[in-house]
Amino acid sequence: MLLRAALAGFVLASLTLPVQAETIRIAIGTQDATINCAAGGLLIRELGLLDKYLPHDGKYKDATYDVEWKNFTSGAPLTNEMVAGKLDFGAMADFPGAFNGVAFETAGKHSLFISVLSGSIKGSGNGIVVPSSSTVQSLSELKGKSISVPFASTAHGMLLRAVAVEGWDPLKDVNIIAQAPEIAGSALQANKIDAHADFVPYAELFPNRGFARKIYDGSQSNSPTFHGALVDETYARQYTEVVVAYLRAGIEANQLLAAEPEKYSELIEKVTGIEAEVNYLFHGPLGVQTREMTWKPEYRQAVGTAIDTLKLLKKADRGLDLNSFIDDQYIRAAFKASGLDYTEQLANYVQLPLNANDAISGKPITDFTRVAEIWVKGEPKVRHYASAESAFSALDSLKKEGKSIRAIYAQASDSGIKLLADQAWFATDAKGRLSAFLLKGQAQQYAKAKGGKVLDFTDASAKSIASR
């Protein structure tokens, strides 16, 4: 009788043991080099933001947290460790994210896509580059050539769509080969590949390092792309407040990037080795992508497209129920806890705005179609100019003063994305005003319509100096 009572007491005690007494693992897989994931990993880790939001009340009153971080160069190995139960969270793009969901389903489990981190509803971020010595100026010139790409990546999806738009057979009219970005960089430098398609940040990083030239931007395919955060569903149901805490940390990281993009671009460089001027292309105002945490319809569409393409590539043998795989309840809760309006942000499609005065005139910049910027070495802030003419004139003066230049940016007149100005093409209108474009063909089309001329960076700079 006493034994039975003792056992009953033990069972009762075990059933009422507070959850808060346990040690809760928070294992997060990041892709540090995929710099548009910074608000979902690198910055949270480096700035210790997660600790600020982890719950310490209710069932978590006496809980302790074991936070683990692991960095990956792509989404596939990250997914493998999530499925194996070694990671709870992961940050990756739409294609590997879709594969993550399929891999979990295949293993009899479920993962959830809980937040967007950064993206473009048009497709910017993915791109195609050629060796800097190549004469190729557009994708149409690559018929019959070899194009490498990380297989089954978001860039692979972009490449297949771009090939389809050209009317090509991807198995006959172009030779698509699998190649990771770290291998592709060497291949481009050695002219061993005709072109390379890749995801963030390589279509900007390789040109910035001088051995490649961008000839196609993902926005030309008009196919949404994004990177986001996933979590193991079982973990999310058990530790809902921890998931919300992770997303609140991401929201703060996002706000910090918006407020001081140069400062945090420098931090990203310190951690990854990817130059701050490339990081600023994405995280600065009017950037290549928009840091975004809400589930816009276009991003939901991107996941569906990714699943269909993965099935076509025979990398997935099943579909996914997007309504259950994409779960926005956690990011909605994080927005509410952070005092933000999710519905309002869901309807907001504007790029991170530029609130700046022209560095020469001091007047507020109100027309962003011809904006240019200069990052002077040793200066903590980027200088902003209302036009390329003003920037190029200032550039000449800065060089005469002995200043070194980290980067010069120009805003593409058609797509609105930020470009490395020394890689861009320029066209004048009838009044001689400069507009920037990624492609020579785009500049030629504009010049023809406006009665102007096409100029490369060197000629555009010389024209601006001569006109002042």
Feature-to-residue mapping (PLM):
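Short cysteine-rich clusters marking metal-coordination/redox-active sites
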Residues: 358-361
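Conserved C-terminal helix/tail region of periplasmic/extracytoplasmic solute-binding proteins
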Residues: 310-355
